Amino acid sequence: MPQAPDYPTLYQIETAIESAVSTLLTAQSVTNYAARATDTKTAPYVDVQVSLGEATGRLYVDNDGLARDASFNFSLALRIVTNRNDDVTTHRDYRAKIHNVIAQYGSNINGALTYHKVAEIHHSQSTPELQEDDLLDQSAMQFSGIVDIANDSWPAAA
Protein backbone atom coordinates (compact mmCIF):
# COMPACT_ATOMS: atom_id res chain seq x y z
CA MET A 1 0.00 0.00 0.00
CA PRO A 2 1.24 3.52 -0.68
CA GLN A 3 2.35 5.93 2.00
CA ALA A 4 -0.25 8.57 2.93
CA PRO A 5 0.81 12.18 2.25
CA ASP A 6 -0.22 13.31 5.76
CA TYR A 7 -2.07 12.24 8.92
CA PRO A 8 -5.40 13.93 8.12
CA THR A 9 -5.59 11.92 4.88
CA LEU A 10 -4.74 8.73 6.74
CA TYR A 11 -7.45 9.33 9.34
CA GLN A 12 -10.26 9.67 6.78
CA ILE A 13 -11.14 6.09 7.65
CA GLU A 14 -14.94 6.30 7.51
CA THR A 15 -14.87 8.01 4.13
CA ALA A 16 -12.39 5.45 2.76
CA ILE A 17 -14.56 2.47 3.75
CA GLU A 18 -17.77 4.14 2.53
CA SER A 19 -16.12 4.89 -0.81
CA ALA A 20 -14.80 1.32 -1.18
CA VAL A 21 -18.20 -0.23 -0.39
CA SER A 22 -19.94 2.26 -2.69
CA THR A 23 -17.59 1.43 -5.57
CA LEU A 24 -18.21 -2.29 -5.13
CA LEU A 25 -21.99 -1.90 -4.91
CA THR A 26 -21.98 0.26 -8.04
CA ALA A 27 -20.07 -2.50 -9.84
CA GLN A 28 -22.94 -4.84 -8.85
CA SER A 29 -25.50 -2.40 -10.37
CA VAL A 30 -26.71 -1.28 -6.94
CA THR A 31 -27.55 2.43 -6.82
CA ASN A 32 -26.10 3.82 -3.60
CA TYR A 33 -25.30 7.03 -1.74
CA ALA A 34 -22.73 7.93 0.89
CA ALA A 35 -23.97 8.94 4.33
CA ARG A 36 -23.85 12.68 3.74
CA ALA A 37 -24.90 12.72 0.08
CA THR A 38 -27.19 15.55 -0.92
CA ASP A 39 -28.46 13.99 -4.13
CA THR A 40 -32.18 13.58 -4.70
CA LYS A 41 -32.80 9.89 -4.10
CA THR A 42 -35.22 7.78 -6.09
CA ALA A 43 -35.94 4.18 -5.09
CA PRO A 44 -34.37 1.71 -5.43
CA TYR A 45 -31.16 2.72 -3.65
CA VAL A 46 -28.88 1.89 -0.72
CA ASP A 47 -27.53 4.37 1.85
CA VAL A 48 -23.98 3.58 2.99
CA GLN A 49 -22.72 4.83 6.37
CA VAL A 50 -19.63 3.91 8.39
CA SER A 51 -19.14 4.81 12.05
CA LEU A 52 -15.76 4.44 13.69
CA GLY A 53 -15.76 2.96 17.18
CA GLU A 54 -13.28 2.30 19.93
CA ALA A 55 -9.61 1.75 19.13
CA THR A 56 -8.53 -1.89 19.54
CA GLY A 57 -5.28 -1.13 21.36
CA ARG A 58 -2.91 -1.78 18.45
CA LEU A 59 -0.48 1.14 18.26
CA TYR A 60 1.98 2.57 15.76
CA VAL A 61 4.92 4.65 16.99
CA ASP A 62 5.59 7.46 14.53
CA ASN A 63 8.93 9.14 13.74
CA ASP A 64 8.39 11.63 16.58
CA GLY A 65 7.96 8.79 19.08
CA LEU A 66 4.21 9.38 19.42
CA ALA A 67 2.13 6.21 19.86
CA ARG A 68 -0.89 6.43 17.57
CA ASP A 69 -3.96 4.20 17.45
CA ALA A 70 -3.65 1.98 14.38
CA SER A 71 -6.72 -0.26 14.56
CA PHE A 72 -10.38 0.54 15.19
CA ASN A 73 -13.73 -1.14 15.57
CA PHE A 74 -16.26 0.10 13.04
CA SER A 75 -19.86 -0.42 12.04
CA LEU A 76 -21.24 -0.39 8.52
CA ALA A 77 -24.92 0.49 8.15
CA LEU A 78 -26.62 -0.13 4.83
CA ARG A 79 -30.23 0.96 4.34
CA ILE A 80 -31.99 -0.55 1.33
CA VAL A 81 -34.98 1.38 0.00
CA THR A 82 -37.16 -0.06 -2.77
CA ASN A 83 -40.59 0.78 -4.16
CA ARG A 84 -43.06 -2.01 -3.42
CA ASN A 85 -45.11 -1.33 -6.56
CA ASP A 86 -42.11 -1.86 -8.82
CA ASP A 87 -40.19 -5.10 -9.23
CA VAL A 88 -40.48 -6.92 -5.88
CA THR A 89 -37.30 -8.88 -6.53
CA THR A 90 -35.13 -5.73 -6.40
CA HIS A 91 -35.18 -5.62 -2.61
CA ARG A 92 -34.21 -9.27 -2.32
CA ASP A 93 -31.54 -8.88 -5.03
CA TYR A 94 -29.99 -5.84 -3.33
CA ARG A 95 -29.79 -7.72 -0.02
CA ALA A 96 -28.10 -10.68 -1.73
CA LYS A 97 -25.62 -8.46 -3.58
CA ILE A 98 -24.69 -6.70 -0.33
CA HIS A 99 -24.07 -10.02 1.42
CA ASN A 100 -21.91 -11.12 -1.51
CA VAL A 101 -19.80 -7.93 -1.45
CA ILE A 102 -19.26 -8.16 2.31
CA ALA A 103 -18.46 -11.88 2.19
CA GLN A 104 -15.53 -11.15 -0.12
CA TYR A 105 -14.10 -8.29 1.95
CA GLY A 106 -10.60 -9.76 1.96
CA SER A 107 -10.21 -9.34 -1.76
CA ASN A 108 -12.74 -6.79 -2.91
CA ILE A 109 -13.09 -4.21 -0.11
CA ASN A 110 -9.41 -4.32 0.79
CA GLY A 111 -8.55 -4.09 -2.89
CA ALA A 112 -10.50 -0.82 -3.07
CA LEU A 113 -8.81 0.72 0.01
CA THR A 114 -5.63 2.78 -0.35
CA TYR A 115 -4.29 3.15 3.21
CA HIS A 116 -6.44 0.77 5.27
CA LYS A 117 -7.22 -2.91 5.60
CA VAL A 118 -10.44 -4.44 6.89
CA ALA A 119 -9.18 -7.15 9.24
CA GLU A 120 -12.64 -8.63 9.77
CA ILE A 121 -16.29 -7.85 9.16
CA HIS A 122 -19.38 -9.70 10.35
CA HIS A 123 -23.11 -9.39 9.78
CA SER A 124 -24.66 -8.23 13.03
CA GLN A 125 -28.31 -7.49 12.23
CA SER A 126 -30.93 -7.03 9.52
CA THR A 127 -34.16 -5.23 10.23
CA PRO A 128 -37.00 -4.99 7.68
CA GLU A 129 -39.25 -1.92 7.77
CA LEU A 130 -42.38 -0.85 5.94
CA GLN A 131 -43.29 2.75 5.07
CA GLU A 132 -47.07 2.58 4.53
CA ASP A 133 -47.43 6.19 3.33
CA ASP A 134 -44.79 5.93 0.63
CA LEU A 135 -45.21 2.24 -0.19
CA LEU A 136 -41.50 1.77 0.34
CA ASP A 137 -39.80 -1.35 1.61
CA GLN A 138 -36.70 -0.71 3.69
CA SER A 139 -34.14 -2.97 5.27
CA ALA A 140 -31.42 -1.86 7.64
CA MET A 141 -28.40 -4.14 7.37
CA GLN A 142 -25.71 -3.78 10.03
CA PHE A 143 -22.16 -5.10 9.91
CA SER A 144 -19.38 -4.73 12.46
CA GLY A 145 -15.68 -5.13 11.99
CA ILE A 146 -12.13 -4.06 12.60
CA VAL A 147 -10.14 -1.79 10.29
CA ASP A 148 -6.38 -1.33 10.48
CA ILE A 149 -4.20 1.43 9.15
CA ALA A 150 -1.72 -0.41 6.92
CA ASN A 151 1.81 -0.47 8.36
CA ASP A 152 3.39 0.99 5.23
CA SER A 153 0.78 3.75 4.87
CA TRP A 154 1.96 5.96 7.72
CA PRO A 155 3.36 9.35 6.60
CA ALA A 156 7.10 9.91 6.86
CA ALA A 157 6.72 12.92 9.18
CA ALA A 158 4.03 14.62 11.26
Task: Show which residues each predicted segment covers.
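Short, surface-exposed loop/turn motifs that are enriched in glycine and acidic residues
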Residues: 7, 87-88
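Acidic-leaning, charged glycine-interspersed low-complexity segments
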Residues: 46, 99-148, 156-158
